[in-house]
Amino acid sequence: MGDDRPFVCNAPGCGQRFTNEDHLAVHKHKHEMTLKFGPARTDSVIIADQTPTPTRFLKNCEEVGLFNELASSFEHEFKKAADEDEKKAAAGPLDMSLPSTPDIKIKEEEPVEVDSSPPDSPASSPCSPPLKEKEVTPKPVLISTPTPTIVRPGSLPLHLGYDPLHPTLPSPTSVITQAPPSNRQMGSPTGSLPLVMHLANGQTMPVLPGPPVQMPSVISLARPVSMVPNIPGIPGPPVNSSGSISPSGHPIPSEAKMRLKATLTHQVSSINGGCGMVVGTASTMVTARPEQSQILIQHPDAPSPAQPQVSPAQPTPSTGGRRRRTVDEDPDERRQRFLERNRAAASRCRQKRKLWVSSLEKKAEELTSQNIQLSNEVTLLRNEVAQLKQLLLAHKDCPVTALQKKTQGYLESPKESSEPTGSPAPVIQHSSATAPSNGLSVRSAAEAVATSVLTQMASQRTELSMPIQSHVIMTPQSQSAGR
């Protein structure tokens, strides 16, 4: 048996034998073409399936912490800033602390409100409701006050000989501090907190104040001026007739913002110096004495500070939906309009059909009258033909012609005639014997000629069988009649 099939397959687990080498080669090729997923390949590297399914996407987001950042990024940043403030509070007294807040309000005796937003920023997004701003009576402890600065991201820096503030990214937040009199020097706070700006994309950016320099006054505010800022994407608070903010118009803050406000209030009360600061997410109010000057970096398109701005009312987005609902709720009215349109179209169609039918009737009447007229003409012509036939038959046996035939036997032979063959045969002119030669008129002569011609034509048919003898008879009366 082994001699019949000497070629053995050397594949593991296969001991088949073949009679020739070609069969063995084909068999080995089958082994090569077979995919092997058995335990022999368990020691190899297994590639993990990373198809981006929704479940895996959500799992990755939870592992990275994206949902936590979306939910509590604002609260997390403020907690971090509050912890840093508490750690540095024990180091030394503070003249003014600036936590990482988008807006800071400082109040003194006489309020002056300054707008720090462009005039064309509408209040349309009700997503982030502003907080009710609280005003705390300041307790100045130190003599030196920091130099007044108003930071407007995206605005022009101060060119006054000192390092400008660093935030230049466009953001709807602004930091405004109090402006002291122009003769004051900036005192470097010994234990001041770092100023952290919270940007719109969820990141924080530290802001370092510049060295102490003498700041000249740029804008002198002689009287209190009030304006309401309009920050893009945040609804502005309502403004009364005097331009001040009405606290009753603010919506109820969220739970996270309430906790943040409580934390900041506790921090302000723990510090025995500086001034009260309350975060207002929608507006920024700067108060100062009327005699004090203030340096303001403001948007170049900002309006004059003497005109208060009132935030426009939010448009109601449910107008189209309400219209659709009213249409859906009134199917009878919709059917009524549909029937009215159908009736109007049917009336127009009837009017067009009437005009078409009337034009056809008018054309038919015209053709009928024309047909009647033509039929009348045909009848008249037929009557005239009948009368002519009767006249011809009546003159066939004229008595004058018969008398001439009896007396003279008139016939003209075509051979002896000087006229060519086929010409009219003899012309017989009749004349009345009783009428005088000069008494015939032209009409009577014409009638006589016509009568003679008709008589000749009738006599030619009756006398063709007779012997051909032609004689021309001219009466003397005819010559006188011809004259």
Curated annotation (Swiss-Prot):
Effect of T51A: Severely reduced TAF12-induced transcriptional activity. No effect on MAPK9-mediated phosphorylation. Greatly reduces MAPK9- and adenovirus E1A-mediated transactivation. Abolishes adenovirus 2 E1A-mediated transactivation
Domain of life (superkingdom): Eukaryota
Result of changing C14A: Greatly reduced JNK2- or adenovirus E1A-mediated transactivation. Abolishes adenovirus 2 E1A-mediated transactivation
InterPro entries according to UniProt: bZIP, bZIP_sf, bZIP_transcription_factors, TF_CRE-BP1-typ, Znf_C2H2_sf, Znf_C2H2_type
Sorted UniProt keywords: Activator, Chromosome, Cytoplasm, DNA-binding, Host-virus interaction, Isopeptide bond, Metal-binding, Nucleus, Phosphoprotein, Telomere, Transcription, Transcription regulation, Ubl conjugation, Zinc, Zinc-finger
Reported effect, L35S: Severely reduced TAF12-induced transcriptional activity
The protein's name in its UniProt record: Cyclic AMP-dependent transcription factor ATF-7
Recorded name of the encoding gene: ATF7
